[in-house]
Amino acid sequence: MSEELAQHCIVCTSPSKTFNLAGLVGSYHIVYNSWWRDRMEKESSLSHYNMMNVLSMHALIGAYKPEGYEWTDELCEVLTGNIDFACDYIEKHFEGVTVSKPQGTYMLFVDCTDWCKAHGKTIEDVEHACWDVGAAIQDGTMFFGPCHLRMNLASPRSRIEEAFHRMDKYVFNA
């Protein structure tokens, strides 16, 4: 990155999602421009909230060691497998339900518009039916999908498979 670009960039990052460290304060920012850096440090220190502590500092250091890189590679393999499984399962078993493979996230955005129309159901009906059989999903309306579900695929494959089998048997093909 050029020096000129560095003076106009602020990078905010964290190991929270990748390493499941959200309960620890580990976010940080990289700011080359001293005026912006001083201003950010002043503003962020006013509440004394989100200040890194000894435990979070060591968690951050551990996450960014070579073992953390290996773990991240394995995590990406598991998540990719879960995404492939979910997308294939939806395509083969949930007629009227469509999905696009996500890029860079483990959240699946599922379009149930055609299925709901064909079965006279609302997305709320689908959401409640999924929860009733132990498949934890989220209404996609807040993400501008009026008849969409949002599914978190960051779980062991066995849990993902069980949830999809339940949705198949008790929700989409009941």
Which residue ranges define each predicted feature?
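PLP-dependent class I/II
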Residues: 1-174
